Curated annotation (Swiss-Prot):
Catalytically driven reaction(s): L-seryl-[protein] + ATP = O-phospho-L-seryl-[protein] + ADP + H(+); L-threonyl-[protein] + ATP = O-phospho-L-threonyl-[protein] + ADP + H(+); L-tyrosyl-[protein] + ATP = O-phospho-L-tyrosyl-[protein] + ADP + H(+)
Active site positions: D176
UniProt cofactor(s): Mg(2+); Mn(2+)
Keyword vocabulary terms for this entry: ATP-binding, Kinase, Magnesium, Manganese, Metal-binding, Nucleotide-binding, Nucleus, Phosphoprotein, Serine/threonine-protein kinase, Transferase, Tyrosine-protein kinase
GO MF: ATP binding; metal ion binding; protein serine kinase activity; protein serine/threonine kinase activity; protein serine/threonine/tyrosine kinase activity; protein tyrosine kinase activity
Protein name (Swiss-Prot/TrEMBL): Dual specificity testis-specific protein kinase 2
Modification Phosphoserine occurs at: S219, S369, S456, S460
Amino acid sequence: MDRSKRNSIAGFPPRVERLEEFEGGGGGDGNTVQVGRVSSSSYRAIISAFSRLTSLDDFTREKIGSGFFSEVFKVRHRASGQVMALKMNTLSSNRANLLKEMQLMNRLSHPNILRFMGVCVHQGQLHALTEYINSGNLEQLLDSDLYLPWTVRVKLAYDIAVGLSYLHFKGIFHRDLTSKNCLIKRDENGYSAVVADFGLAEKIPDASIGREKLAVVGSPFWMAPEVLRDEPYNEKADVFSYGIILCEIIARIQADPDYLPRTENFGLDYDAFQNMVGDCPSDFLQLTFNCCNMDPKLRPSFEEIGKTLKEIMSRLPEEELERDRKLQPTAKGPLEKVPGGKRLSSLDDKIPHKSPRPRRTIWLSRSQSDIFSHKPPRTVSVLDPYYQPRDGATHTPKVNPFSARQDLKGGKVKFFDLPSKSVISLVFDLDAPGPGSTTLADCQEPLAMSSRRWRSLPGSPEFLHQACPFMGCEESLSDGPPPRLSSLKYGVREIPPFRTSALSAASGHEAMDCSNPQEENGFGPRLKGTSLCTGAASEEMEVEEERPRRASVYFSISGISLQTQAKQDG
């Protein structure tokens, strides 16, 4: 599909390919924004507003998931037939995180990062439209009976690592990386993984300066021990979460400590887990243990993880052929019906008789060679100074540290906070990759968007909202930073795109007004003159542009009044 059409929605103006097309040339010194003709700016405001905003009634909907903060629908645009995913916020207190997530996703462009498509307006609230991923999430895939050879499992692990490496390169870390938030895409090339759900993302702390300690956020089973202990943490917390995901991939079990063995200090029980890995490649298991190290300083970076996984993938085909050759004479009887399948051996002595999750059959996923007690070729160890193994001689019972703390509610809870000023400003601070880089920005072309704020957005006719429990890119084309912005109640800033450049090239940061996030996202006092969105069929949407040269133009489209104010500075 033509990239220029991939994110466009029928009935709205097409995206422009370059900002210069409307500003009479590009460029900037990195500190100022060049301003073009008034008519160009006004036209760009229309494109920006109406190519990105849609009403809920513009789509047919099919619910595909729900969870703590949102409901997810597969939607099809009635006019164009374009299929997307709609993430509808169900918790008013999470509105600020949702707005931040949309802003952040709009600035990210990577094949393994969920692509942002636009915004849907319903009853005065904004809901994110993203690309539709057709095979659910990683947890669902691992819970299925599908045969997943090690080549597929390592490839999925690699996709997640590369996506997180890109995110960390941008100065952001996820803070809620789970198997539920890793979506699975299946096409003619097989399976691939896409990282999603950036509502709790935060700016990576600068170790060189003292900073306020970050809040405890995330999903407990995947949270790093230092986060659970309310200690200072950084992007290496994502690496621990990733290590837990690798454990899920290797053994095809849940992250719940009733399945995945943990220690009393929230670490991974390496000794117990080694009995559950079957014929896992030893290098892959070693990497998993390194990621789960209790000491954040000893965990590898995602760049290092990606390199290691690439080496493992290059060796896997030969290793798997050799394993299959050795096992061929032994595979007999009913086992041949499900080679390498899931749930082939019961975990009688490892799993309690009463499962905390009765919806799942309690069986361990093993590859074919594991059925015949094939062990890894070498012993895997990890240098973890905080590891507290269970005493096997005394048959110490399985440990669930999440049940010992009342605030963790057995791990069946999710912690979140309001976005900080630093991460909101970071949405406008992301460095662009250098010229000639096509790998990271290959997933989509950017939309031309202006530096404006929206207020009193139009609502759509009422939709019967179902109550259910969760399921869980942009690069800029401009050379210079956008003007400083501000926002009013229910205000949402459009993210100006920036020019693609090399990863190693340093570029000037974009600045914004880091006003109180609670006020700007609807939690503070409403400023005088602002209008609340209550789902009216037609309300005024005002687009303001804070630039030296301004004009005043009014447009009325489908009962919605769009206003741009401007005047020429003397």
